[in-house]
Amino acid sequence: QIERMANKMDLVILPIQGVSDDGFIELKKRGYCMKDFFASLRKETLIFTGVITPYIKKLPQTVISLLAREEVVAANAALTAEGILAMVIQNTPRSLPEYRYDVIGFGHCGRAIAGLFHQLGLEVRIVSAHAHPESAQLPYSFIRLQEWQFQQPWPVVINTAPAEVISEAMVAGWQTQPLIIDIASRAVGVSERVYKRKDTHVI
């Protein structure tokens, strides 16, 4: 039905992750093929998205990436950090200071989450695949991803890195299972097999 309305639309707002390479968008963990919809749009229609994917680049319409605007990125990261804080509160039985927090990735969202948690007096450790020259001046401890992957994680693990960083083999070697919150694009940070394990808590 939406394809029938496409040629009447002046503006289209896509999910933040945009459109996959094969023309699908994901809503509430369900995929929807949008090829016919995009083919029916007028060339004058404006398209707003978060991520500009290869599929979107090929469209003849004007595409505006909200994530290319620094103020939007900063606001989105701040809201994400607040949402993560709420998720931790809802999914842990003890008070926040009783836990320590691993934040994987030090991009906009990673920095916002670490900053908010630090402001609340919580102990935060940044897990990053890359060295950060400014780390000595920041109030967090830092550990390289390659080293962290062979250690017992802290009780709460928050992944922002857009790559698989937690495998089933890693989880199988942990003595205790942390709460894992994966907010990476398309939820790729945690292996699908980890989600299926009954002894892990992944959000």
Segments and roles (model prediction):
Residues 53, 107, 129-131, 184-186:
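Residues in the short beta-alpha loop(s) of Rossmann-like NAD(P)-binding domains
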Residues 1, 120-138:
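NAD(P)-binding Rossmann-fold cofactor-contacting core
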